[in-house]
Amino acid sequence: MTRRFALIFVAFMATASLVLAACGAQTPALPALTDPKEILTESVLSLKDLKTVEVTGTFTGAVTLPELGALDLSTVKISAAADIPGKKAKFSLDAPTVLGTRIDALLLDTAAYYKIAGPLAMMAGGSADKFTKVDVPQESGKPVTDVAELAKQIDEFKALLDKLPTPPTKEADEKCGDQDCYHVSLKLTAADLKALDPTATATDGNFSLDLFTRKNDRLPARIALSVTAPDLGTVGMTFEFKYGGSVSVDAPPADQIAP
């Protein structure tokens, strides 16, 4: 009995040692960030290795259009998913209170399919019943994963942040579901935007952006946008992101494609 107990104890200790060794070999935690510009930059940089992403979007507020009155945006929903290496994606917009608008779109490498319900169908030449197929041009230029191109884009992004009349602010850290997140806010007026790009079309209003960045991998977890304008009121948009899931996108059956 004593010998058997000793063997069990040795086996237990060996197993525990393996478990502890595996835990110790895990990727160390990333260093904490305090500079809001650095958080924004690392959040953008984290996208270079992105494989799959799922996005959901919701809206608040209403917009007033000539001859149409106020359109409630609280029922508008967006969902999207993309497999970056697989070159496939899907997107849907459901806006029942915006003149019954609905958009469904699929992307498979060099072919895209879409169908549209509502007034936009006439403008885009689509159908509410069947998918319209269009060819997608092959990408030109350097891919975003090209090291030199990526470094150039990051430098341009940092330069843009340095030009902001009102710099971004780091707010208190928050929970994003089960993730610990940094919270960075950015507020701009129409005058700020004009200062950034004097050639841009004049806009009257205030804009705010709140970015919630996951601490463990720097990926964006949530983005909240808000626009306030005299002739528009206040419109809000919130986008939630998930990563690493399986994304399935298939071409529509032949009988569901418009001739």
Regions flagged by a language model, labelled:
Residues V19-A22:
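C-terminal motif of bacterial Sec signal peptides marking the signal peptidase cleavage site
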Residues T2, G24-P259:
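Subset-of-secretome marker
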Residues M1-M13:
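Bacterial N-terminal signal peptides that target proteins for export
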